[in-house]
């Protein structure tokens, strides 16, 4: 097992001569570690404080060797640029059913990305695809139904299954959410060859404990390999906390090996005091996000777990069967690039499911309404965007290549309509402008989007 530290993640911590030590067998370290680029910060002459290439992960030596081999083999090959979505529904459907143009020795991997609502699943999918095709916002339940993205590179096809955040039957009923938000994540994991579990480490109430619904999902499918992705690490002030979070969420075990994390710059008496404080704060954190635990037994039928298993999971903090751990941030694309390389190298021989020009299985109209909804969630307060509906009045592809779209927004109250329109129409104009810009990048053409608002009786 090896631990590699991202420059971007631990940049501030590197001002200290020695910050943290990860105890793990390094006698047979991977060649990837021995030959990879490394630099030693000024003033460190004792072997500690090395700065390795960006992208931080914990993984087995054997896989690191495969990762290095795969990277070396693909550095000089042709890169398949991200595809675009065809703006015509019939053409998009025709492309989806078109025979795959797979090469000899093709490889494929289906990846289910799961996590609590607002963990950053859709953002990660967009970064991996190299193009924004999934709606994202700071509010929960932006993703309402499962959709997939297709990443094709050389002889490998990665199918990303973007899912709604795992939720409970109680919350679905309370907030009048679609049934798909409850069922889609569970069904997706059944089809996956790899599960990516996203955790927002900037959420101080939940970062030390896996979401209860996530634990149930992992427990039901222990045979599906899973990796942990710690997201938004750039927002964490104390970078050394990442080590503690990793230990908590993995139960101190990664790829079947125990992970020992301890401070090395404090005297023993200070270390003992820190341990006591950590245990005290840890017990408090476990109680904070207990809302999902309360109705765990209500989803017994969906999860397929017995009441005894569900009760046991209530006291479980992490998952001891993660194969690897990655740390990513929205500000550093190199971290995501390493995760992408991991997926490509981990793909197995098999037939492609889609033509290499396919980017997503969403229809152009679905992408449009999801993009508009993203902006509504971003700029409108409280429950307003959740109660709105949309209808596409116009979809016209001009001869000059421009795409004209007109969408009617329906609200329930006059007061909501005033919020959507804004002062002198500034709010609705802003939403139309930003949504139109996003659609232009998806369809690779100029998009003129017009929005109108109406109170629905």
Curated annotation (Swiss-Prot):
Residues 162-165 are annotated as: G3. Residues 1-18 form a transit peptide. Its main location: mitochondrion. One of its GO terms (molecular function) is rRNA binding. GO terms for cellular component: mitochondrial inner membrane; mitochondrial matrix. It is a peripheral membrane protein. Residues 376-457 form the KH type-2 domain. The keyword Coiled coil does not apply. HAMAP family: GTPase_Era (MF_00367). This is GTPase Era, mitochondrial. It comes from Salmo salar.
């Amino acid at each position: 097992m090896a631990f590699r530290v991202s420059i971007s993640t631990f940049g501030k911590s590197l001002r200290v001569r020695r910050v943290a030590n990860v105890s793990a067998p390094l006698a047979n370290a991977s060649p990837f570690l021995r030959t990879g680029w490394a630099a030693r910060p000024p003033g460190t002459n004792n072997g500690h404080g090395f700065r390795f290439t960006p992208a931080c992960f914990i993984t087995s030596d054997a896989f690191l060797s495969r990762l290095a081999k795969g990277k070396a083999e693909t550095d000089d090959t042709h890169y398949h640029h991200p595809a675009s979505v065809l703006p015509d529904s019939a053409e998009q459907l025709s492309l989806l059913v078109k025979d795959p143009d797979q090469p000899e020795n093709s490889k494929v991997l289906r990846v289910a990305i799961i996590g609590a609502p607002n963990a950053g699943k859709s953002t990660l999918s967009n970064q991996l695809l190299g193009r924004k095709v999934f709606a994202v916002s700071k509010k929960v339940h932006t993703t309402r139904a499962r959709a997939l993205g297709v990443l094709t590179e050389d002889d490998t096809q990665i199918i990303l299954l973007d899912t709604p955040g795992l939720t409970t039957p109680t919350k679905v009923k309370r907030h009048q959410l679609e049934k798909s938000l409850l069922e889609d994540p569970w069904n997706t994991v059944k089809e996956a060859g790899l599960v990516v579990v996203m955790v927002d480490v900037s959420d101080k109430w939940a970062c030390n404990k896996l979401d209860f619904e996530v634990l149930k999902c992992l427990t039901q499918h222990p045979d599906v390999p899973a990796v942990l992705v710690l997201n938004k690490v750039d927002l964490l002030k104390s970078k050394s906390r990442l080590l503690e979070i990793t230990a908590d969420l993995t139960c101190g075990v990664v790829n079947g090996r125990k992970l020992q994390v301890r401070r090395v710059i404090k005297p023993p008496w200070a270390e003992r005091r820190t341990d006591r404080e950590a245990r005290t704060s840890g017990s408090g954190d476990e109680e904070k996000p207990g809302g999902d635990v309360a109705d765990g037994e209500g989803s017994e039928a969906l999860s397929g777990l017995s009441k005894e298993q569900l009760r046991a999971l209530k006291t479980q903090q992490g998952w001891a069967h993660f194969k690897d751990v990655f740390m990513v941030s929205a500000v550093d694309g190199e971290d995501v690039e390493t995760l992408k390389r991991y997926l490509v190298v981990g793909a197995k021989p098999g037939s492609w499911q889609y033509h290499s020009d396919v980017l997503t299985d969403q229809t152009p109209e679905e992408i449009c309404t999801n993009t508009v909804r993203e902006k509504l969630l971003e700029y409108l307060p409280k429950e307003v965007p959740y109660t709105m509906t949309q209808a596409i009045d116009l979809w016209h592809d001009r001869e000059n290549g421009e795409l004209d779209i007109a969408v009617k927004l329906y609200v329930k109250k006059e007061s909501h309509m005033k919020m959507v329109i804004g002062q002198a129409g500034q709010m609705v104009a802003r939403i139309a402008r930003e949504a139109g810009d996003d659609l232009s990048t998806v369809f690779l053409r100029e998009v003129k989007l017009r929005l109108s608002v109406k109170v629905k009786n």
